[in-house]
Amino acid sequence: MTATIIDGKETAKEKREQLAKEVEELKAQGVVPGLAVILIGDDPASVSYVTGKKKAAETMGMKFKLDRFDSSLTEAELLTVIDQYNQNPEFHGILVQLPLPDHISEKAVIERISPDKDVDGFHPLNVGKMLLGEDTFLPCTPHGIVELLKKTNVDLSGKEVVVVGRSNIVGKPVGQLLLNENATVTYCHSRTKNMSEHTKKADILVVAVGKANFIKADQIKEGAIVIDVGVNRLESGKLCGDVQFDEAKEKASFITPVPGGVGPMTITMLAHNTVKSARRTLS
């Protein structure tokens, strides 16, 4: 079998068109969804991500503001900027681009953003609501993954899901969201013994470790759905995922490519959360 490609670009495009309509509806009621992004330093990957966020937000008719600071910015100064946006009704979402310089506490920054404007879904209050299955801002990449899985029309209930990776940004929350969909979830990580024994049982395999071509075809169950979250740049300059794509696509039933799989959904779900936050101001 050759796997059906799960087209993240196409799914993101459909979702963005829907969001653009919702933005127009909100504007008609006097609310312009606003996203404020804070970028510290000049890490090329971060600059690229922020550029993508700006383009997406403006294409959907949202207000976008970027505050760029030198990496000498102190933690106290950053927290003051966050406080100003927390109080500013023109902005419904606040995002501080990670990673941060070593002298700034990621925890302090995440906890300073108002839970009502935490469109990344990282604030402990929103993480707690996610664990409880309550309505909240879901983390963007995990939420995007669930949306892509739903496009396959496969019933997630009762499926064996294996998540390789346990980061707070992707691994842990995507497992929780799939548990909320009644899947049976196993986590694998750097201390897991005999990882292949677990991955070969997976009906749905989600890989988010940041290691190029880490998972090979012989670790994948025949007919599995494979979601590859990794984005790695090879010495040749070519981008690849955490899964050996050419091999895996001959074994899986569905697979996400890199690039063009999970990535486009992340920014789309960020826009979704910003629109959701703007809509809340009406109620």
From Swiss-Prot:
Pathway: One-carbon metabolism; tetrahydrofolate interconversion. Keywords: Amino-acid biosynthesis, Histidine biosynthesis, Hydrolase, Methionine biosynthesis, Multifunctional enzyme, NADP, One-carbon metabolism, Oxidoreductase, Purine biosynthesis. Coiled coil: none annotated. Pfam families: THF_DHG_CYH, THF_DHG_CYH_C. It catalyses: (6R)-5,10-methylene-5,6,7,8-tetrahydrofolate + NADP(+) = (6R)-5,10-methenyltetrahydrofolate + NADPH; (6R)-5,10-methenyltetrahydrofolate + H2O = (6R)-10-formyltetrahydrofolate + H(+). NADP(+) binds at G165, R166, S167, S190, V231. The keyword NADP applies. One of its GO terms (cellular component) is cytosol. One of its GO terms (biological process) is purine nucleotide biosynthetic process. InterPro entries: Aminoacid_DH-like_N_sf, NAD(P)-bd_dom_sf, THF_DH/CycHdrlase, THF_DH/CycHdrlase_cat_dom, THF_DH/CycHdrlase_CS, THF_DH/CycHdrlase_NAD-bd_dom. Homodimer. PANTHER family: C-1-TETRAHYDROFOLATE SYNTHASE, CYTOPLASMIC (PTHR48099:SF5), C-1-TETRAHYDROFOLATE SYNTHASE, CYTOPLASMIC-RELATED (PTHR48099). Belongs to the tetrahydrofolate dehydrogenase/cyclohydrolase family. Catalyzes the oxidation of 5,10-methylenetetrahydrofolate to 5,10-methenyltetrahydrofolate and then the hydrolysis of 5,10-methenyltetrahydrofolate to 10-formyltetrahydrofolate. This is Bifunctional protein FolD. It comes from Bacillus velezensis (strain DSM 23117 / BGSC 10A6 / LMG 26770 / FZB42). The gene is folD.
